[in-house]
Curated annotation (Swiss-Prot):
Binds 1 heme group per subunit. Its cofactor is heme. It comes from Tetrahymena pyriformis. Heme binds at H73. This is Group 1 truncated hemoglobin. It comes from the Eukaryota. The modification N-acetylmethionine is found at M1. Keywords: Acetylation, Heme, Iron, Metal-binding, Oxygen transport, Transport. Monomer.
Length: 121
């Protein structure tokens, strides 16, 4: 019996993640709601961390070596509107890369589970 595909596999695996995350950050850095959070951020490092985190979160290999989400976002005063902006930018990125709405919705549901940790609530 075949094992069901992970969301990571449905997205296209490593190559898809390496294409998606830089495009995602291009959108994020143009988004007035959230771009200020990245003002003094090493975006090469951030892109690698996010690629590793999303890969792990969506069912791919776990190479993520960063902080847990609560610790990583502590003191940033993130609100629901900021988290929503991130989800919207990721969904737009995946749509632009030809991912189906069904797979985008699957990914969004998994990512939604990190909201409380990222917002520190």
């Amino acid at each position: 019996m075949n094992k069901p595909q992970t969301i990571y596999e449905k997205l296209g695996g490593e190559n898809a993640m390496k294409a998606a995350v830089p495009l995602f950050y291009k959108k994020v850095l143009a988004d007035e709601r959230v771009k200020h959070f990245f003002k003094n951020t090493d975006m090469d490092h951030q892109t690698k961390q996010q690629t590793d985190f999303l890969t792990m979160l969506l069912g791919g290999p776990n190479h993520y070596k960063g902080k847990n989400m609560t610790e990583a976002h502590k003191g940033m005063n993130l609100q629901n509107l900021h988290f929503d902006a991130i989800i919207e930018n990721l969904a737009a990125t995946l749509k632009e890369l030809g991912v189906t709405d069904a797979v985008i919705n699957e990914a969004a549901k998994v990512i939604e589970h990190t909201r409380k940790d990222m917002l520190g609530k």
